[in-house]
Amino acid sequence: MRIGHGFDVHKFGGEGPLIIGGVRIPYPQGLLAHSDGDVALHTATDALLGAAALGDIGKLFPDTDSAFKGADSRALLREAWRRIAAKGYRLGNLDITLIAQVPKMALHIPQMRVNIAEDLGCHMDDVNVKATTTEQLGFTGRGEGIACEAVALLVRTS
């Protein structure tokens, strides 16, 4: 078994859309990023790549490459997962924590889990997404952006 950890932060800005966990969330701003800014999927991708010792999302999909400008983070996650599975791993579980004062995430979490499980070809019970605030402290508490952490467990299949 192998464990990986992911962390990402994006600042609010622009008109959107705001996409988290592959879900469009109604909010007046999006997240500033080279790709679509999906902080949850970026974090999940980093945790999975780390567990497989395949580097990180920036190594695989550099923000200096115009091919990834505005990229769909679900497509990036699927490509990372293809490489991980090719190394002989399956998902044990993935646990994601969104850290944001706004917007509220609870209503969107079930669909996030469905999207991620679909992209990883696993059961929804293998994917957990939760959200918390920082009680109005720091940049997330001031509503300036969103942070996210994830932990992934991979199990060798071959």
UniProtKB/Swiss-Prot annotation:
Q: Name one GO molecular function term.
A: metal ion binding
Which reaction does this enzyme catalyse, per its entry?
Answer: 4-CDP-2-C-methyl-D-erythritol 2-phosphate = 2-C-methyl-D-erythritol 2,4-cyclic diphosphate + CMP
Enzyme Commission numbers on file = 4.6.1.12
Residues that coordinate or bind 4-CDP-2-C-methyl-D-erythritol 2-phosphate:
8-10, 34-35, 56-58, 61-65, 100-106, 132-135, 139, 142
Which Pfam family would be a valid example here?
A: YgbB
Q: In which pathway does it act?
A: Isoprenoid biosynthesis; isopentenyl diphosphate biosynthesis via DXP pathway; isopentenyl diphosphate from 1-deoxy-D-xylulose 5-phosphate: step 4/6
**UniProt-listed SUPFAM superfamilies:** IpsF-like (SSF69765)
Keywords, alphabetical: Isoprene biosynthesis, Lyase, Metal-binding
Residues reported to bind a divalent metal cation: 8, 10, 42
Q: Which GO terms describe its biological process?
A: isopentenyl diphosphate biosynthetic process, methylerythritol 4-phosphate pathway; terpenoid biosynthetic process
Co-factor requirement: a divalent metal cation
The signal peptide annotation in the UniProt record is none
What does the note under cofactor report?
Binds 1 divalent metal cation per subunit.
PANTHER family xrefs: 2-C-METHYL-D-ERYTHRITOL 2,4-CYCLODIPHOSPHATE SYNTHASE, CHLOROPLASTIC (PTHR43181:SF1)
What function does this protein fulfil? Involved in the biosynthesis of isopentenyl diphosphate (IPP) and dimethylallyl diphosphate (DMAPP), two major building blocks of isoprenoid compounds. Catalyzes the conversion of 4-diphosphocytidyl-2-C-methyl-D-erythritol 2-phosphate (CDP-ME2P) to 2-C-methyl-D-erythritol 2,4-cyclodiphosphate (ME-CPP) with a corresponding release of cytidine 5-monophosphate (CMP).
Q: What is this protein called?
A: 2-C-methyl-D-erythritol 2,4-cyclodiphosphate synthase
This chain is encoded by the gene named ispF
